[in-house]
UniProtKB/Swiss-Prot annotation:
Highly expressed in adipose tissue. Detected in lung, skeletal muscle, large intestine, kidney and testis. Expressed in lung, brain, kidney and neural retina (at protein level). Expressed in Mueller cells (at protein level). The modification Phosphoserine is found at residues 505-506, 518, 543, 551. The gene is Slc1a5. This is Neutral amino acid transporter B(0). One of its GO terms (cellular component) is melanosome. Sodium-coupled antiporter of neutral amino acids. In a tri-substrate transport cycle, exchanges neutral amino acids between the extracellular and intracellular compartments, coupled to the inward cotransport of at least one sodium ion. The preferred substrate is the essential amino acid L-glutamine, a precursor for biosynthesis of proteins, nucleotides and amine sugars as well as an alternative fuel for mitochondrial oxidative phosphorylation. Exchanges L-glutamine with other neutral amino acids such as L-serine, L-threonine and L-asparagine in a bidirectional way. It comes from Mus musculus. Belongs to the dicarboxylate/amino acid:cation symporter (DAACS) (TC 2.A.23) family. SLC1A5 subfamily. Na(+) 2 binds at residue 396. The keyword Transmembrane helix applies.
Length: 553
């Protein structure tokens, strides 16, 4: 016998609802009234928390400029003295040392893991597209620099300047002739194939010329070749990491490990685990970056003896360089990115704001590389096997800012000396600047070292480089920002290309090595999911799959 459920008392329901509704209504009314205020506060708080590091870094740059100008107004370097100035710059020096400490393991391990995660055919396509992008953007930057310099005529505004910063130039370097373009090309090839990998971590090869009667000390390790009765060619190893040779070796070594098949999987996992641990160190260093950047910028401004007179004398040249970098970085590169990806380029730029500010503070593409890798992966969604393969290459060969600055400087020096540039000389400047920027080291003032090649190519006096050195502390920072921005946009474009073409990659297995992956014992050669084996499902899609080892030949 079915029992009817008890009926609810309508009065009780009415009473309960009358008791509850006012309270509920009051909460809704209160939340509606306070939602606009509290909700906006919460959004602002979350936004600040998510972008705290970016805001701190940008604020550090602004504070560094203000602090430097304030100390300069109070007497500057003369009032501080050499000892106090060194202590004043110590926090910035510490940041540079921390970043440079990370470069070597990061470049080698990331490139080995990235090259091992792509098939050789995919590796070739990605590398070819990257080099094409870097070449096109460098040519565009060079053309923009020449066009702006011809339009603004910065050299015509400079009068009665003979040696604004002679103290910066080494007196021994003034009398030495400049090496030829062929010597620079041969040095580039020598650095691609280092004779010693250990020494390549801190030394690179360079050719120079010295007079026979030069009183400057010549290192005993240099190979001397007599050119004529007055000149000697020196083949020496100079201080500075040979990052180009390390990049080439790491890529080739990664390809070789992939060709080994399962035998090389343990070593691939080792390099990927090493790289992941290095990125943890990078995340810690990033929180010290604002402090170091503040003192790097401030100390560099304090070192300049007369900033005001410098800007008055070379203001048009500085404006030409900074305007060119701004146009290329805020219009040209974002436009290329938008045309190929149909994504908002300025949202991409906001994601790499911390590395850009770090590049301005450190003035080194190589030192910014660890932070750039972390930001493009976490903020902009670039896959690890793309960023860790492309960004080290870009830090070596992609120098948009250097190419633009060199073209502006060449036209500036030509106008300063009253030399007219015809069409052939302009093309020579474009081609030489693009080619020489590839070999420019990713170190502070690396572009100035290759500027002499361009001046020699169009028969302009090399001695006027001393004018460029006077303001290089500012222009070189702008160059570095543009260089690393071009690297990041290149990684973003290649990520879009890989997504569209569905390029095969073993990245999830090889790059993202998690703790749950068992390293001992190693998976058998027939284990499912081995990225170095090709799996063929049976006709019915069952588990009876066959595996075939990838050929080493």
């Amino acid at each position: 016998m079915a029992v009817d459920p008890p009926k609810a008392d309508p009065k009780g329901v009415a009473v309960d609802s009358s008791r509850r509704c006012p309270a509920l209504g009051s909460r809704e009314d209160q939340s509606a009234k306070a939602g606009g205020c509290c909700g906006s506060r919460d959004r602002v708080r979350r936004c600040i928390r998510a972008n705290l590091l970016v805001l701190l870094t940008v604020a550090a740059v602004v504070a560094g400029v203000g602090l430097g100008l304030g100390v300069s107004a109070a007497g500057g370097a003369d009032a501080l003295g050499p000892a106090r100035l060194t202590r004043f710059a110590f926090p910035g020096e510490l940041l540079l040392r921390l970043l440079k400490m990370i470069i070597l393991p990061l470049v080698v391990c990331s490139l080995i893991g990235g090259a091992a995660s792509l098939d050789p055919s995919a590796l070739g396509r990605v590398g070819a597209w990257a080099l094409l992008f870097f070449l096109v953007t460098t040519l565009l930057a060079s053309a923009l620099g020449v066009g702006l310099a011809l339009a603004l005529k910065p050299g015509a505004a400079v009068t009665a300047i003979t040696s604004i910063n002679d103290s910066v130039v080494d007196p021994c370097a003034r009398s030495a002739p400049t090496k030829e373009a062929l010597d620079s090309f041969l040095d580039l090839v020598r650095n691609i194939f280092p004779s010693n990998l250990v020494s390549a971590a801190f030394r690179s090869f360079a050719t120079s010329y010295e007079p026979k009667d030069n009183s400057c000390k010549i290192p005993q390790s240099c190979i001397q070749r007599e050119i004529n009765s007055t000149m000697v060619q020196l083949l020496c190893e100079v201080e500075g990491m040979n990052i180009l040779g390390l990049v080439v070796f790491a890529i080739v070594f990664g390809v070789a490990l992939r060709k080994l098949g399962p035998e090389g999987e343990l070593l691939i996992r080792f390099f990927n685990s090493f790289n992941d641990a290095t990125m943890v160190l990078v995340s810690w260093i990033m929180w010290y970056a604002p402090v170091g950047i503040l003192f790097l910028v401030a100390s560099k401004i304090v070192e300049m003896k007369d900033v005001r007179q410098l800007f008055i004398s070379l203001g048009k040249y500085i404006l030409c360089c900074l305007l060119g970098h701004a146009i290329h970085g805020l219009l040209v590169l974002p436009l290329i990115y938008f045309l190929f990806t149909r994504k908002n380029p300025y949202r991409f730029l906001w994601g790499i704001m911390t590395p850009l500010a770090t590049a301005f503070g450190t003035s080194s593409s190589s030192a910014t590389l660890p932070l750039m890798m972390k930001c493009v992966e976490e903020k902009n969604g670039v896959a690890k096997h793309i960023s860790r393969f492309i960004l080290p290459i870009g830090a070596t060969v992609n120098m948009d800012g250097a190419a633009l600055f060199q073209c502006v400087a060449a036209v500036f020096i030509a106008q300063l000396n009253g030399v007219s540039l015809d069409f052939v000389k302009i093309i020579t400047i474009l081609v030489t600047a693009t080619a020489s920027s590839v070999g420019a080291a990713g170190i502070p003032a690396g572009g100035v070292l290759t500027l002499a090649i361009i001046l020699e190519a169009v028969s302009l006096p090399v001695k006027d480089i001393s004018l460029i050195l006077a303001v290089d502390w500012l222009v070189d920072r702008s160059c570095t920002v543009l260089n690393v921005e071009g690297d990041a946009f290149g990684a973003g474009l290649l990520q879009s290309y890989v997504d569209r073409t569905k390029m095969p990659s073993s990245e999830p297995e090889l790059i993202q090595v998690k703790n749950e992956v068992s390293l001992n014992p190693l998976p058998l050669a027939t284990e499912e999911g081995n990225p170095l084996l090709k799996q063929y499902q049976g006709p019915t899609g069952d588990s009876s799959a066959t595996f075939e080892k990838e050929s080493v030949m």
